[in-house]
Amino acid sequence: MKNYQINLKKELNSIYPTLEHLQGVNPNGEHISFTNHYMMKDEKPFFGICGEFHYSRYDFHKWEDEIIKMKMAGINIIPTYIIWNHHEEIKGQFRWDGSFNIRYFVELCKKHQVEVILRIGPFVHGEARNGGLPDWLYGEPCNVRSNDERYLFYVKRYYQEIGNQVRGLFYKDGGPIIGVQLDNEYCHAGAPWEMTTGTSNEWINNGSYDTSVEEHHHHIEILKEFAIEAGMIAPIYTGTGWGGAQASPDTVLPLWGGYAFWPWIFYDESIKEHPVTPEFIYRNYRRLLIILNRLMIRLQCLLLAVKWVEG
């Protein structure tokens, strides 16, 4: 007769520190770091709940109200695009006032104890005009989103301007900026040069230019060097980590951004209803709570009835 055994023992996965190049300490000694399973803040597991807010697309008088609402909803990190063509619409003339005042926005986040990730582009997409690139860049004799020296000259100048605006607001300074994203959807997505729409219909290259993976990674490394030289020194540097994007994993942390709602599918006019998406994982516990509440009421009524009978 055969003997059978059931082994219910489960080997737990080992957890160990990793990504030593992506960490930082603030003046209070609090530490941001990573293990192979999760992010840590002050040596404890930290679950970052991000909510996008693009400051330059909203009236600055209302920023604080919106930040408070986001925090009340459970958001503890606000990533924000810095959209180049909002700040340098005219070549060489930068605007950082009013609704373009990135410093004021970050200071409000600090006031309400919300961390910040700066998404500095230079290309951000974000459904912005030219993906955020200024119109005047179209007329420059250079290949954007490449290692073209002329393009990199303008990018470096732009990064220096950003760095001047947010100086002293990084995590190492006691500020809320914990991360910097370099480009966006690099080698994955481009955008139309809007001024050519309806005529030549030209598009901004996604950055691939049929060059090697090593060259793509080198581009991200150059952007990181420019950011650091501009004073944008953060614990975390990120890049798009999906759809064939090149994020240089030894330089930045590849991140996946999922969409519960896919607006682009409605370009196909035959689609009338939005399908369930894999990013939309939700369980409605409210119905369960209602059922439990009703059961508790019935149980209380039953106990009162028993006491009345016994009494």
What are these regions (language model features)?
Residues 1-77:
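N-terminal carbohydrate-binding accessory modules
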Residues 17-18, 24, 118, 123-154, ...:
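Substrate-binding/catalytic cleft of secreted carbohydrate-active enzymes
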Residues 30, 55-61, 87-88, 92-97, ...:
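Acidic-and-aromatic substrate-binding clefts and catalytic sites of carbohydrate-active enzymes
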Residues 43, 70, 78, 109, ...:
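Conserved, mostly hydrophobic/aromatic
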Residues 50-52, 89-91, 207-210:
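A short, structure-level motif marking secondary-structure boundaries and short turns
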Residues 52-54, 81, 183, 239:
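Conserved residues at the C-terminal ends of beta-strands
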Residues 58-64, 95-101, 152-160:
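Glycine-rich anion/phosphate-binding loops
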Residues 63-131, 135-136, 220-229:
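Aromatic-lined substrate-binding rim segments of carbohydrate-active enzymes
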